[in-house]
């Protein structure tokens, strides 16, 4: 029996959507939502946030002439409905997979994706830039819409952009998708009535006529205009929560139900005609339409494949623990013994493994929101108050606070403990989340010490050792990976000597200098080279600063060639720093650095990406063997 055709089957692009009668849009939304649930239950991906914006996405593409009209998504992990409606429906099953769809908007994928996104707070700046460019270009006429969440709109960048937009008074729309931290409650039917009035063409037209008339009145005109504007604003402020946005120069509408697609279409059609910057405040629900995700949107923010009937996900290998979970557990142990310890995170309690720590020591955890610049300066100041701050942050987000790293920590030599998660290749989140820059800038900072654990016990030992280290700021950086729990001892005495490294094997033909997370691939390369008859030294560089230069040069004096293996960009990692210190005595011995080339590193599983860039053990061994043979170094 042939399956009955659905409305979604008829929609490949927004032009097809606009041919659907308005009254059938709720059915379209239902089908889009079911398609997301059906697909992601099999492949995983960002889930709850996408279920929460189905009606909004359908309404936007129904009202606006995309891609001529610009839709700009903040962060972008909520764009699966957008991808479904813009020609990528059949590829959603490949999302976040190697050579598949990105989990975020991506310019190379579609003309409907204006910007590659992944970090928060950028959309309003981009929307304002689009509006300014439009108005400087003769003959251009298109709408610009930024869609931003309630967490992102509190970022400094978003507020800076709103301040500028209020000054420029460009025609643009900001849609506030409020799905977690409600700014204010809807006051009911009066608010709805007012919103209907202020979005009407009639109201806005005669308001402009009225104020123009007042300006022409001699003597009393300007004063009367100011008076009536204050009355209008005051009446609106009493009944609706938009005072802050009005003060920034935005016309405010809301809060509105973000799941009433027909009302949204009618509202957006009116807002589209309004002049100046407009903010439309929508209340939505993460996980909308799927009970488990509605009950626990944090758990279902990002999912692995799950059982559609009840949302059950594989609990994973219980014999392993994530590096980030080690952080939370170890900080709990340390704080129990030392009340001066504090943990700081920019809106990443779950991701940074701090959930249990937050429950156990709520007064010692400071979640500063999406405010990386503030978080670093805040941590630096805590050291001045004799507190021991552990700044827990993803590598990709620390780049947002480089100025504070320089000015507010390293130049003053303040002993902040930086715990840098997701360093190196992070896999499915793709180019905007890869942690490939941190070693380049950390090693260029005055006073900053850098430790790169190569296993879980190193991680534990460094967290404990850092507690009493107050001579300088220090950073430890570690991958998004799991380690065997049974190999870990959270209470052992620490023997961590700065400037040391481990010599795991000694040979005479070649030395592999492995940095942190690349140790496993370096071990595989060593085994392959030794099986081919080469004599190999394998060095595990766990301390980059301070670096044991004399001891390292001593080891290199016993080999004929050496290579560096670093899970960073070749030109922005540790190799330049290392070579400046060891090349003077080993110039003729250097072969190459294995790392990523200076290009965006796309999404996929870490193993797939490592292999694609020939950074796996087998590829390293093959490349090195070829070089050795060309240099007449034979096994």
From Swiss-Prot:
Cofactor(s) the record lists:
Mg(2+); thiamine diphosphate
| Annotated InterPro entries | Dxylulose-5-P_synthase, THDP-binding, Transketo_C/PFOR_II, Transketolase-like_Pyr-bd, Transketolase_C, Transketolase_CS
Pathway note: Metabolic intermediate biosynthesis; 1-deoxy-D-xylulose 5-phosphate biosynthesis; 1-deoxy-D-xylulose 5-phosphate from D-glyceraldehyde 3-phosphate and pyruvate: step 1/1
Q: One Pfam family, short name please?
A: DXP_synthase_N
Residues the record lists as binding Mg(2+):
150, 179
Which superkingdom is the protein from? Bacteria
Q: Which family does it belong to?
A: Belongs to the transketolase family. DXPS subfamily.
What is the name attached to this protein's record? 1-deoxy-D-xylulose-5-phosphate synthase
From what organism does this protein derive? Answer: Leptospira borgpetersenii serovar Hardjo-bovis (strain JB197)
